[in-house]
């Protein structure tokens, strides 16, 4: 370390001790701007340290601002930005602003005096009345004055006085909330003042941030004045605004430790008044994790005999990580006119001040060479223990003092104690090479951070601690630091997808163990979930309810706080935290609220009150907020249930009634019947319908009320299902509706909303099944109910779900939602909306509850036009379907009627065979929309006529089976009922048909059949002969009366006289069914596709896929009696003979390959 012991103490004329380092500021230009900075930094320090409940804060605010600043000082505030932006404030605007500020100061002084008197005698009703009057007077004065301080056209130059008035107003309202009831105000009035306070925090913050950013944008490019504006207005406006949220006395009821992580720049280190002639566009750093300077290496060059700062290298570390080392690239050049100057900074040291020696040299004649450079800098350091540290000297000390632009925050302390900023980085500007040496410039630019953001994240045991997440020590892959909106005191973090932000290391300062409630300040474009990952297991689930729209800019109103349901107990002095978030979530900071019995009860009450009030659209509780789910209301109810009876029994009862009212409102707007799952299949036409394996279970540690469990299934044709229809009478025309609910866990859960078409999502939500691991017994209450009030191991209630390949994931959280648009309503048609949950895999499962179907919003603009187009398209296709149905129904009915001998459908025609029945069944199944393709138990538009004809087909099968005297004729039951000689096989072919194979000439199967002598019978056989020779099917009686059917490989097919065909005539692709499930008569599936009345070249006149419009056909429709008619292999033929038995017993016998 290079040390120059000469001139170690620099004069600073505001200090009484001449031995203490001092600064001569008498000759400094822009005095007004420096004074504004001093006042603003003093106010910021006061807000950081003294924003405590009670009257002392108001007294202090009066003492440092409103009791000491007069017209001259207010004029300095106005002059500051006038100089920065080169815009003069018109005289009448200036005079009006100053007069208003004076009036506010006078009114506030009277209020403060009455507050002092009341505090001395708080039970004096006269003093209570007086302080109420003084409060109202000052409040009204502020309401009138603040619009004048944002005069149109002068918003930017008025910012510094606007923020002072805004700060005063928030302080005044905070007093009313804190003291209101003791002043004699009723609860409603106090709550009204609180609501005004919260609203004005957002209003004032947004105004200041908006016009600050507008002011920066007006510069266009980065210049020296740009840096001055960024620095000075940050100090005089944004730093104060960043602390506005702490005025929320109910959220921050005790002293709060805040930090300002923003980074500002002092002016380029150059001789005052000299033109820079350098490009400053690369001076600003990109958003980054907060870092702390650990090493500065300065390289020295020489130009025209002047040794100067030619370039430098910087190393830094992140917060709380001594081992981290961020090495930045070389700035400038690594010149070697002198040995490098190496400045190594201990982790306990801070560079709080620089004294630079810039030089502006002009040499030569008519075309002189101009040199702008820095000959030396003294870096003054302080230690964390408030001790002065030896300075670092690079070559020489100069008179350009950083305190001119960044004065101390406390002038009553030595500068190494009262300083306001620490040096964190330096960049470098240089002249263009093409202009050198006539214009030569080498100029460093220093950047600084506020001293409130220290190098460690210490958590207090007695105060609320706010730690911006930009103070993490690592930035995880995929996470980004983005520029803060202006009112957060620094930059913020986000991610474009699900993942972690980065590890934040905290240090506990109190005696261990320490318990804290944890809050996160965030903004979110949708209802999202996240996980707080803790180095002392387990992890904790978080919800991030929507605070803004997707295209909305970040404003103060966009930010909210979310709280862990249970406190965290820290048992170690250091802890690592990380946060898992989803896309569209922006993280500002984490907050630690210390817990003790009394404070915890008060905190829980405040949190419950805030949560209950947030349920409603207004204070009169007439309506619920649309985006608040039924599940959320249950969680708020749990919050109220867990309030302490000892500390707040009356408040608990009042809040409980409000939550019950909210629950009733939630039930009223929910169009689903039996949303609490009192039963399934209880009423034929109402409520929930479902498969018999669904169970209803009472509330657990996830659900407060009943929920349903859907298991997996072994056959996708028989899925687990749950459905309900929303009646047309409940729907409004041209309105969007939303289905939503909560899924504890699921695998392969399909969700459908069906009207004109089907909206379909498959949701996989990992879950533990319980909040409690197997080794831990879930806490229960005295009656066996889940105890939701004990400290719990939390899981992620909004965990990202995983999607099956090729399927779109419905949601990224346990909260799911799906919307559907309704066009014109027609009570006669009663189209309604079908709500379906389905699982069709063996591994599938789901637990879900708090289901809601509710009106979301009227359709406007493009959404309205889109639903009208969809409705017209649906109606056009429905009309086409009706025409096609009429044709198909007529043909199907004719085929069915032809099977029977009479109109009572109780006797078959004598020549009706199994092929004819299957052919008729085929035609019946060409009737589309008999059932919903999404779930075949739900009737479709053509269910009536389909079931009419299908019932007659079933009758035909029954009659046919009843008149067939051969048992097990289709070999579906193997060789049951058959006598076997030799070796035979039963094979199941790929079309699920059982086939008898007789492989050897000596093998045969036979069956004794009882018949009625004198009656005629038909023996009909379908068979195929392999190889040479012949196979026989014989029928004989005991008297050896024998007939036979012979099958030869070389003979041509014999055809039944009335055009009976083998099923080769009907390929399956003509039918439009592609399912794998067979019909109930498996032995006849695909065997008899022939019918005497169906022409071989028949094809449908419509195309089914053209109608579905994204809705797939039901692959399991054949489970209702019709299979996938795959053609038989070539060579099979059907033969028959008539037989008239003379006895009551005959023997059919098969030889060789016979079916």
Swiss-Prot record:
Q: What else is known?
A: Toxic segment of the protein is located in the N-terminus.
Which family is this protein grouped under?
Belongs to the delta endotoxin family.
Keyword Membrane on entry: no
* Annotated GO MF terms: signaling receptor binding; toxin activity
Which keywords accompany this UniProt record? Sporulation, Toxin, Virulence
The record's annotation in InterPro entries points to:
Cry1Ac-like_dom-VII (IPR048645), Cry_V (IPR041587), Galactose-bd-like_sf (IPR008979), Pest_crys (IPR038979), Pest_crys_Cry1Aa_dom-IV (IPR054544), Pest_crys_dom-III (IPR005638), Pest_crys_dom_I (IPR005639), Pest_crys_N_sf (IPR036716)
Q: What is this protein called?
A: Pesticidal crystal protein Cry1Hb
Per the UniProt entry, what are the Gene Ontology biological process annotations, in alphabetical order? sporulation resulting in formation of a cellular spore; symbiont-mediated killing of host cell
| Record Pfam families | Cry1Ac_D5, Cry1Ac_dom-VII, Endotoxin_C, Endotoxin_C2, Endotoxin_M, Endotoxin_N
- What is the recorded function of this protein according to its Swiss-Prot or TrEMBL entry? Promotes colloidosmotic lysis by binding to the midgut epithelial cells of insects.
Q: Which domain of life is it from?
A: Bacteria
Q: Does the keyword Metal-binding apply?
A: no
């Amino acid at each position: 370390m290079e040390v120059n012991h000469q001139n170690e103490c620099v004069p600073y004329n505001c200090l009484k001790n001449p031995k203490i380092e001092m600064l001569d500021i008498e000759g400094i230009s822009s005095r007004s701007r420096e004074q504004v900075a001093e006042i603003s930094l003093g106010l910021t320090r006061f807000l950081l340290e003294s924003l405590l409940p009670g009257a002392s804060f108001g007294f202090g605010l009066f003492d440092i601002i409103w009791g000491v600043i007069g017209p001259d000082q207010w004029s300095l505030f106005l002059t500051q930005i006038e100089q920065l932006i080169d815009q003069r404030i018109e005289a009448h605007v200036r005079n009006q602003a100053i007069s208003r500020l004076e009036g506010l100061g006078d009114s506030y002084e009277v209020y403060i005096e009455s507050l002092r008197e009341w505090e001395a005698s708080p039970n004096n009703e006269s003093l209570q009345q007086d302080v109420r009057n003084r409060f109202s007077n000052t409040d009204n004065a502020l309401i009138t004055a603040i619009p004048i301080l944002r005069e149109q056209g002068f918003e930017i130059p008025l910012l510094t006085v606007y923020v002072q008035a805004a700060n005063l107003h928030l302080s005044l309202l905070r007093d009313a909330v804190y003291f209101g009831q003791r002043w004699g105000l009723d609860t409603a009035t106090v709550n009204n003042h609180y609501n005004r306070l919260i609203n004005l925090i957002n209003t004032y913050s947004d105004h200041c941030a908006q016009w600050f950013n507008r002011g920066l944008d007006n510069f266009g490019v980065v210049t020296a004045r740009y840096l001055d504006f960024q620095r000075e207005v940050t100090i005089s406006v944004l730093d104060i605004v960043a602390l506005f949220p702490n005025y929320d006395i109910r959220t921050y009821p005790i002293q709060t430790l805040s930090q300002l992580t923003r980074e500002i720049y002092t002016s380029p280190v150059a001789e005052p008044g000299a033109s820079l002639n350098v490009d400053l566009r690369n001076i600003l750093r990109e958003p980054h994790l907060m870092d702390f300077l650990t090493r500065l290496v300065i390289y020295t060059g020489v130009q025209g005999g002047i040794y100067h700062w030619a370039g430098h290298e910087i190393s830094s570390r992140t917060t709380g990580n001594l081992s981290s080392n961020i090495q930045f690239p070389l700035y400038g050049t690594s010149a070697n006119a002198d040995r490098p100057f190496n400045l190594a900074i201990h982790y306990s040291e801070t560079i709080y001040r620089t004294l630079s020696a810039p030089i502006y040299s002009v040499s030569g004649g008519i075309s002189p060479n101009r040199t702008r450079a820095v000959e030396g800098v003294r870096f003054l350091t302080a230690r964390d223990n408030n001790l002065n540290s030896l300075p670092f000297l690079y070559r020489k000390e100069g008179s350009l003092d950083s305190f001119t632009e960044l004065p101390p925050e406390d002038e009553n302390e030595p500068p190494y104690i009262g300083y306001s900023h620490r040096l964190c980085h330096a960049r470098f500007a240089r002249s263009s090479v093409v202009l050198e040496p006539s214009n030569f410039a080498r100029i460093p630019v220093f950047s600084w951070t506020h001293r409130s953001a220290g190098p460690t994240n210490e958590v207090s045991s007695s105060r609320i601690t706010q730690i911006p997440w930009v103070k993490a020590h690592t930035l995880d892959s995929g996470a980004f630091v983005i520029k803060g909106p202006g009112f957060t005191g620094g930059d913020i973090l986000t991610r474009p997808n699900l993942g972690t932000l980065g590890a934040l290391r905290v240090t506990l300062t109190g005696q261990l163990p320490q318990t804290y409630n944890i809050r996160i300040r965030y903004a979110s474009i949708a209802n999202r979930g996240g996980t707080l990952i803790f180095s002392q297991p387990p992890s904790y689930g978080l919800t991030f309810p929507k605070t803004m729209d997707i295209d909305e800019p970040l404003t103060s109103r966009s930010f909210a706080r979310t709280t862990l349901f249970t406190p965290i107990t820290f048992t170690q002095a250091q802890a690592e935290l990380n946060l898992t978030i989803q896309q569209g979530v922006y993280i500002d900071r984490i907050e630690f609220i210390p817990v003790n019995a009394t404070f915890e009860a008060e905190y829980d009450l405040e949190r419950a009150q805030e949560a209950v009030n947030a349920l409603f659209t207004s204070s009169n509780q007439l309506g619920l907020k649309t985006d608040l789910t039924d599940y959320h209301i249950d969680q708020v109810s749990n919050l109220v249930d867990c309030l302490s009876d000892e500390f707040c029994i009356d408040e608990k009862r009042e809040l409980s009634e409000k939550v019950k009212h909210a629950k009733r409102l939630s039930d009223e707007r929910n169009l689903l019947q039996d949303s609490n799952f009192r039963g399934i299949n209880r009423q034929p036409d109402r409520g929930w319908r479902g498969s018999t394996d669904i169970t209803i279970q009472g509330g657990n540690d996830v659900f407060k009320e009943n929920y349903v469990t859907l298991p997996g299934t072994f056959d996708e044709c028989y899925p687990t299902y749950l459905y309900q229809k929303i009646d047309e009478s409940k729907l409004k025309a041209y309105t969007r509706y939303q289905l939503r609910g909560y899924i504890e866990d699921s695998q392969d859960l399909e969700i459908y909303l069906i009207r004109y078409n089907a909206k379909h999502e498959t949701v996989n939500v990992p879950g533990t099944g319980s909040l409690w691991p197997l080794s831990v017994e879930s806490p229960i209450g005295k009656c066996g109910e889940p105890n939701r009030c004990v400290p719990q191991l939390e899981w992620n209630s909004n965990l990202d779900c995983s999607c099956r390949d090729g399927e779109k994931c419905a949601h990224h959280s346990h909260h799911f939602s799906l919307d559907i648009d309704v066009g014109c309503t027609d009570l006669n048609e009663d189209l309604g909306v079908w709500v379906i949950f389905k699982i069709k895999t063996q591994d599938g499962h789901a637990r879900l509850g708090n289901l809601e179907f509710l009106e979301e919003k009227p359709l406007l603009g493009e959404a309205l036009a889109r639903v009208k187009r969809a409705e017209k398209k649906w109606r056009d296709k429905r009309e086409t379907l009706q025409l096609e149905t009429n044709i198909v129904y007529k043909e199907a009915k004719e085929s069915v009627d032809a099977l029977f001998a009479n109109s009572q459908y109780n006797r078959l025609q004598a020549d009706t065979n199994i092929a004819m029945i299957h052919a008729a069944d085929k035609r019946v199944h060409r009737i589309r929309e008999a059932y919903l393709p999404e779930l075949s138990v739900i009737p479709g538009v053509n269910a009536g006529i389909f079931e009419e004809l299908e019932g007659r087909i079933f009758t035909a099968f029954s009659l046919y089976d009843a008149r067939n005297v051969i048992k097990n004729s289709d070999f579906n039951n193997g060789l049951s009922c058959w006598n076997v000689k030799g070796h035979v096989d039963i094979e199941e072919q790929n079309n699920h048909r059982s086939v008898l194979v007789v492989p050897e000439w000596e093998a045969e199967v036979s069956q004794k059949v009882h018949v009625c002598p004198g009656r005629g019978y038909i023996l009909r056989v379908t068979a195929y002969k392999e190889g040479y020779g012949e196979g026989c099917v014989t029928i004989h009686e005991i008297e050896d009366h024998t007939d036979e059917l012979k099958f030869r490989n070389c003979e041509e097919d014999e055809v039944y006289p009335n055009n009976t065909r083998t099923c080769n005539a009907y390929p399956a692709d003509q039918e439009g069914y592609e399912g794998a499930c067979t019909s109930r008569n498996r032995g006849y599936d695909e065997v008899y596709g022939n019918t005497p009345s169906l022409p071989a070249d028949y094809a449908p006149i419509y195309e089914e896929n053209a109608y579905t419009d994204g809705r797939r056909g039901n692959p399991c429709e054949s489970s209702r009696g019709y299979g996938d008619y795959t053609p038989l292999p070539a060579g099979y033929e059907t033969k028959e003979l008539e037989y008239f038995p003379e006895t009551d017993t005959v023997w059919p016998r098969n030889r060789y390959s016979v079916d």
